[in-house]
Amino acid sequence: MPKQKTHRASAKRFKRTGSGGLKRFRAYTSHRFHGKTKKQRRHLRKAGMVHAGDFKRIKAMLTGLK
């Protein structure tokens, strides 16, 4: 049976945390900031965590990620 490979697009978008969770980055951060408030822009800078409902599916794509 061939080796299971890491989904490379997912590996670039998620990082493993020290406690075993998955850190994700927020959407809506590339352009069109003039329509957003300072508070919205500040919150978009922070990374978020992957929700429990998505965790199992994303973890399967990231088999080789340490």
UniProtKB/Swiss-Prot annotation:
Tree of life domain: Bacteria
What Pfam families is this protein classified in? Ribosomal_L35p
The region annotated as signal peptide is none
* Molecular function terms, GO-annotated: structural constituent of ribosome
Does the record bear Ribosomal protein in its keywords? Answer: yes
Database matches in Gene3D superfamilies: 4.10.410.60
**Region Disordered, annotated ranges:** 1-21
Q: Which UniProt keywords apply?
A: Ribonucleoprotein, Ribosomal protein
SUPFAM superfamilies documented for this protein: L35p-like (SSF143034)
GO terms, biological process: translation
Please provide one cellular component term from the Gene Ontology annotations of this protein: cytosolic large ribosomal subunit
**What PROSITE patterns would the database entry show?**
RIBOSOMAL_L35
UniProt keyword Ribosomal protein present: yes
Indicate, by first and last residue, each region the UniProt record lists as having compositional bias (Basic residues): 1-16
**In which family does this protein belong, per the annotation?**
Belongs to the bacterial ribosomal protein bL35 family.
| Classification via HAMAP family | Ribosomal_bL35
Protein name per Swiss-Prot or TrEMBL: Large ribosomal subunit protein bL35
Please give the organism. Streptococcus sanguinis (strain SK36)
